[in-house]
């Protein structure tokens, strides 16, 4: 398989500071340094041979793009990755390196939204399969394998699982698995206060699109959460927490 089982690491300093046992799921040790590989690969692994032969397309400026690129290379499937023209060259080079000759990178638009719309256009024009970064059942299920590993690696009762939220794919996948095997375990979403589209949507009981989002955590800076992820989050999340930029910087410095 492309994605690997990652370590569940005991965080001694955090545990001592908080007076609780804190474990970290080290998804930064994936080949693309992110959990995004799980969802991208799972989506592509469920495509028919005919669909794989036609190829896939994705829009991303970061980790999802690398996940699709590496999966395409391993599965020998052509992939088109649409990235904003503002994407740093190091990220573009990383996608090309992961995918090699199997990947075509197209730079389009000033923002992720522009790149996404162009990818949707090319999907129809070329007959490709769109690999959504979060709002897709197979992508969500792929991210959910993280929770499966956690419960296999740790045999004691788990009080709560804290999950970062962007578009909602990660918390949806983890939340569905957790609630199926351990209903008493809390699933707590964590968002930046300046990009908390899911938090606002859940409070309003409808999807809320933000005009602007903060970019300190650019991987979770999503203006509008997915339809499917919103539906699932309403069922599985226990609560949400938002953090200010100053608090996030302070925590990073202490870690």
Model-derived features: positions:
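PLP-dependent amino-acid enzyme catalytic core
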Residues: 1-243, 247-248
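Hydrophobic alpha-helical segments, chiefly the membrane-spanning helices
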Residues: 245, 252-255
